[in-house]
């Protein structure tokens, strides 16, 4: 196999990992703060793609599509947390059943509104085509995805590590009861984190819809990858989500390219090995 093959597969894996980071970072923070296993998180990705598709077709603005999807799905997430999931605090089975129910409802609503055909979110002409870097050819749109994920990752790091809001979020992740005891409004922090996680997933849905497409069932296809990222990286850890996304993207892409009949093994076997050595994940804490 040529050097170009390895470079192309590595870059494809990195760009897919960047997309997974948009989905998994919010999922990780939601679990870290609220201890909720949100099985409807993939639905935010799918619905974000559909909302972005609709706005992009009506306005021809990709930027507006991303913003509209993020805001709309953030409001959906806030409604779920405030009126449903908050009432099930500490009830893991109830949360799982509730979020599965929402995932199925969202999928049926998507089918009812947009039908069962696959769509591709229109992207700006500026992001189409390829460019040559160091003798290798790279799709411009995938470079854009890596850039967006990098900016989002840096912004999240700055907020979490350098601001008072970030300090409150980190306190809630470490010990919600203690944070509540020192005057932090944990329910409000939880609501904000849930909205942020939903918005990031929706942004990923719009951006992913530009090359993966938007279709019914996309939510359940991408959700297992997000959970693998969160489990490998460590629950509630932003650096863990970054590293986990990169690992999962590379393993999945190389696994499908080199061992298509064993692609799931090449993804889940390393996850099992990591958990055997570090049950809390690479960056998780007991």
Residue ranges, per PLM feature:
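Helix-loop-helix "hairpin" substructures at the membrane interface of multi-pass membrane proteins
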Residues: 16-17, 22, 136-214, 238-243
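Alpha-helical transmembrane segments within multi-pass membrane transporters and channels
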Residues: 60-103, 109, 243-248, 278-279
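Transmembrane alpha-helical segments in multi-pass inner-membrane proteins
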Residues: 20, 60-71, 191-201, 205-271, ...
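Short, non-helical or kinked segments that cap or interrupt transmembrane helices
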Residues: 25-49, 90-95, 165-168, 186, ...
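Membrane-interfacial amphipathic/re-entrant helices at transmembrane-helix boundaries
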Residues: 1-22, 51, 62-64, 91-96, ...
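Transmembrane helix-bundle core of multi-pass membrane transporters
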Residues: 10, 87-162, 189, 254, ...
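Membrane-embedded helix boundary and interhelical linker motif in transport proteins
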Residues: 11, 33-79, 83
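Cytosolic-side transmembrane-helix boundaries in multi-pass membrane proteins
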Residues: 5, 94, 113, 174-181, ...
């Amino acid at each position: 196999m040529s050097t170009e093959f390895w470079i192309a597969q590595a870059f494809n894996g990195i760009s897919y990992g960047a997309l997974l980071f948009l989905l998994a970072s919010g999922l990780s923070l939601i679990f870290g703060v609220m201890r909720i296993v949100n099985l409807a998180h993939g639905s935010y990705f799918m619905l974000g793609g559909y909302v972005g598709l609709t706005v992009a077709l009506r306005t021809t603005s990709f930027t507006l599509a991303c913003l509209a999807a993020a805001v709309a799905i953030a409001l959906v997430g806030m409604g779920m947390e405030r009126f449903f999931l908050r009432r099930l605090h500490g009830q893991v089975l109830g949360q799982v059943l509730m979020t599965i129910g929402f995932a199925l409802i969202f999928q049926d609503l998507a089918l009812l509104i947009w039908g069962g055909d696959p769509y591709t979110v229109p992207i700006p002409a500026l992001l189409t085509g390829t460019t040559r870097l160091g003798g290798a050819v790279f799709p411009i749109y995938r470079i854009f995805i890596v850039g967006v994920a990098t900016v989002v990752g840096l912004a999240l790091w700055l907020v979490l590590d350098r601001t008072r809001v970030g300090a409150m979020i980190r306190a809630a992740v470490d010990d919600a009861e203690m944070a509540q005891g020192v005057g932090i409004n944990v329910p409000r922090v939880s609501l904000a984190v849930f909205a942020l996680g939903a918005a990031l997933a929706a942004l990923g849905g719009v951006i992913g819809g530009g090359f993966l497409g938007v279709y019914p069932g996309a939510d359940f296809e991408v959700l297992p990858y997000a959970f693998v990222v969160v489990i490998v990286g460590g629950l509630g850890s932003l650096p863990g989500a970054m590293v986990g996304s990169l690992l999962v993207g590379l393993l999945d892409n190389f696994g499908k390219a080199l061992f298509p009949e064993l692609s799931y093994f090449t993804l889940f076997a390393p996850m099992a090995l990591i958990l055997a050595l570090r049950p809390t994940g690479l960056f998780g804490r007991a």
